[in-house]
């Protein structure tokens, strides 16, 4: 789907920007082919080095391709807006507006601006995330867990772009927060165990008194799901696959449940099953659910979950694009939501998939939640 959309937008850019240039056909032709190749670079690279999910080419090459691809998308979108405006000017018979919109330098200038903005976006996508602190009120939280601190990492996407050096910085920043518990809500890695072993090794240094609990996202399935599960556990993580664990303090309990990702269906693996995950759990203990995708929040709330932590959306990547991502994820894209008595938090994520690695106005994050007790009003 991404390649088809990219190809259509590339053809549009060639038609509206490259072809009108006052250059010889011998120059416009290669330029046009270069733009089309850029739109299809995911498939081209995957044919020779790695996969669509995990391009195994040098970091600098990924960054250059990501910058060009993002610029292509931004340029195409602005061109569409300009052409709609030009059509409106024609219909309204506004010659001055038509003249302004037809200036020969306008579209190439937009292209240059798109390239510069994209370079900035890729630099932000590769930046070490900053820490965001969030207080969460949970009804009748046991007093033993008042002030309990949970650090969430999600969408780390360790890869040839976000290497072990970057992961180590994320881990160091996380450990500096001194949380009580670390949870990782999927998409830890892009690629095979052999390709990413060194890049994920720093995750073994994550530490918290109550440990590190992880679930899978969709990208673990694109790599080697069966091999990654024991690899994560060797790094000291407790991986929840439609299961739960219990945190105990002074006789009180907190249930941490985790479900798999729906993409499991493609691979004949277990689909998300919250009922199974909560089987045997104390019904009086508050439930924190780790669910990579936020779109099942309403169904999860109906089953008594107090707090759902998700990722997957990357916050929408770019301001404005978040509205499209929101529609594809049940109306949830970034930050906190009150969902039928449950709190849902959708993290922007720490990293990004190398195939679309831009962040413009949507910063990455490491999230630290402080749990607070909320007493239910009488009569509820």
What is each of the regions a protein language model found here?
Residues 1-127, 376-378:
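Non-catalytic terminal accessory segments
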